[in-house]
């Protein structure tokens, strides 16, 4: 049996911010960061979100490799805890904006379609502690504010 794929088929790779970026220059922890802080032994070889695959520092090289092997799409996430400085006001963090703009620009320069996920293991731990996480309508409203940023 022979399979053929359409010429414009999306061949891609996927990851998420908490699983790839590392915690470099992040002002806030998310629940994934917190889980690693309290139970690092549960992570394979103790490797967790502190450095992860270092995408924060190596995204240009990583995305060039995607292009080199013929991939044309990439799914990742925008971390709420990296993009937003103040969760209540929705004020963006300049470094987070710079980073995600850089990732998007690099994808475009390499002919890679980017798909951005807005939530992947990154509920801000302080919103969980203060309001109870997703059970709180206020947290949902704050997420909507983040999504509109």
Language-model region placement:
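N-terminal carbohydrate-binding accessory modules
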Residues: 1-71
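Substrate-binding cleft and catalytic face of glycoside hydrolase catalytic domains
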Residues: 24, 63-149
């Amino acid at each position: 049996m022979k399979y053929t794929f359409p010429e414009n088929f999306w061949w891609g790779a996927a990851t998420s911010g908490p699983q790839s970026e590392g915690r470099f220059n992040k002002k806030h922890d998310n629940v994934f960061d917190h889980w690693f802080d309290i139970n690092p032994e549960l992570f394979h070889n103790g490797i967790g979100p502190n450095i992860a695959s270092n995408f924060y520092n190596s995204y240009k090289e990583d995305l060039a490799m995607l292009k080199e092997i013929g991939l044309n799409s990439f799914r990742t996430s925008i971390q709420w805890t990296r993009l937003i400085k103040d969760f209540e006001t929705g004020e963006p963090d300049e470094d987070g904006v710079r980073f995600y703009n850089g990732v998007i620009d690099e994808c475009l320069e390499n002919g890679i379609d980017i798909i951005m996920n807005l939530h992947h293991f990154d509920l801000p731990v302080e919103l969980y502690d203060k309001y109870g996480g997703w059970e709180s309508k206020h947290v949902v409203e704050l997420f909507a504010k983040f999504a509109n940023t």
